[in-house]
Regions:
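A broad, structure-centric signal for solvent-exposed, well-ordered loop/edge residues
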Residues: 22, 28, 67, 71, ...
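Catalytic loop of short-chain dehydrogenase/reductase
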Residues: 5, 11-36, 41-42, 46-50, ...
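Short, hinge-like loop/turn segments at secondary-structure boundaries
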Residues: 31, 72-76
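Short beta-strand segments at enzyme active-site cores
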Residues: 10-14, 55-58
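C-terminal helical subdomain
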Residues: 50-59, 75-120
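Short beta-loop-alpha junction of Rossmann-like oxidoreductase domains
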Residues: 26, 53, 57-73
Length: 120
């Protein structure tokens, strides 16, 4: 923010998960951390908006087609790829860029991204 405040522009995007808005049995620590991150993003959004800095929180709910996911979950990936059920990094990036390019009169604070087959 040191460089953004004098310029009166900039974008900070936090990445969360469904746990940012909803807890689940066995995920107390994870949910608590994600909800705290969301609260930090909300506070920063309110503090920095008057200074021209756009702060957003993106919930990414679903597996992302990366080498790491492909290696750890090969059967899951195989099934999801049959139905276009994995998120692609470039598609996620397009949404982040869309947030960055929004005009000040129509800023998004929160965006949920998930494959069409994800249950939520």
């Amino acid at each position: 923010t040191r460089k953004m405040i004098p310029r009166k522009k900039g974008t900070i995007i936090f990445t969360g998960a469904t746990a940012s808005i909803r807890g689940k049995e066995g995920f107390a620590a994870f949910s608590g951390a994600k909800q705290a991150k969301r609260a930090l993003a909300q506070s920063m959004a309110k503090e920095l908006a008057p200074k021209g800095i756009h702060v957003a929180h993106v919930i990414v709910d679903g597996a992302i087609d990366t080498p790491w996911v492909n290696k750890l979950f090969p059967e899951y990936v195989k099934e999801k790829k049959k139905i276009d059920g994995l998120m692609k990094p470039d598609d996620i990036a397009q949404n982040y860029l869309m947030i960055h390019n929004q005009p000040k009169n129509a800023w998004t604070f929160e965006l949920d991204l998930r494959p069409w087959v994800e249950t939520w």
